[in-house]
């Protein structure tokens, strides 16, 4: 049986707390005010009180600045007594995120 290998990240994760707003939960509508645990140019690990399903679509917006993105839930892991860690892949980012991709032509 052939071995399967997980795809490797092209962007490094940086431990950073960024205040964000999450919305788009299918079961529990509304906006959740929360924070990231780490970030990259193409996504973030976010703490949530809600359990999300893999491939759910959500909207993430930074509380400071103009960043907003439609995202895909890559994973949702249970955290002890504090909710869930949600891996978010940015699908349609708009505005200035805290870190830019090395391939971003507008990067300074």
Q: What is each PLM-predicted segment?
A:
Residues 1-108:
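Structured alpha-helical
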């Amino acid at each position: 049986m052939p071995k399967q290998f997980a795809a490797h990240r092209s962007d490094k994760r940086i431990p950073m707390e960024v205040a964000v707003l999450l919305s788009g939960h299918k079961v529990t509508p509304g906006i959740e005010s929360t924070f990231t645990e780490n970030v990259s140019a193409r996504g973030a690990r976010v703490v949530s009180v809600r359990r999300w399903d893999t491939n759910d679509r959500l909207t993430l917006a930074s509380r400071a600045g103009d960043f907003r993105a439609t995202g895909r839930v890559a994973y949702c892991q249970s955290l002890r007594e504090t909710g869930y860690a949600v891996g978010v892949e940015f699908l349609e980012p708009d505005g200035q995120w805290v870190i830019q991709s090395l391939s971003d032509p507008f990067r300074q």
